[in-house]
Regions:
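Short acidic low-complexity segments
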Residues: 27-36
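Charged, amphipathic alpha-helical segments and their flanking helix caps
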Residues: 1-27, 46-156
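A short, hydrophobic beta-strand-centered structural micro-motif
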Residues: 37-48
Length: 156
């Protein structure tokens, strides 16, 4: 069974093995604090919830790929390069999920339901730039009552 924990472990493994990514975290978007991380680019995963459709569970995630420009960097040049690099990392994640399973390999079948990339540009309130990969991952879900940890309940 593929769980939220399994998915986070795979994203962390991807971040550790990727030559571009320097840090990994997960949690809410507000957890991305400039003072919290020393190394950038950062891959930050936000679990936005799941839905159940027939025999499937759909995990919805936001994957932030962010860099911190040097203070003297030319804003436009930096953002162009960083958005390009971050988008390539997002495409590497998708390619591994859809084609290879080098990192995102599980004993169970899954598929990418939808994916989109949004560029994130530096503003006055946020000096980070990169992209947001909005991702849904579809896994089989059987609504199996046999696995419920209920005292006194016998599986049928």
């Amino acid at each position: 069974m593929i769980t939220f924990s399994n998915l986070i472990d795979k994203f962390q493994e991807f971040a550790e093995d990727n030559y571009f990514i320097e840090s990994f975290s997960y949690g809410s978007p507000s957890d991305v604090d400039l003072d919290k991380f020393e190394l950038y680019p950062l891959l930050h995963v936000v679990y936005t919830g799941a839905s159940y459709d027939g025999g499937n569970k759909v995990y919805n995630m936001e994957v932030y790929i962010l860099s911190l420009p040097p203070s003297e960097a030319d804003k436009n040049l930096y953002q162009k390069a960083d958005i390009t690099n971050a988008e390539q990392v997002a495409e590497d994640i998708l390619a591994d999920m859809k084609n290879g399973g080098n990192i995102f390999e599980f004993e169970y079948l899954y598929e990418v339901g939808s994916a989109s990339v949004t560029p994130l540009e530096e503003t006055q309130s946020n000096t980070l730039a990169g992209c947001l990969l909005d991702l849904s991952i579809i896994v089989p879900y059987q609504h199996n009552a046999c696995v419920a940890p209920l005292t006194g309940v016998q599986p049928q």
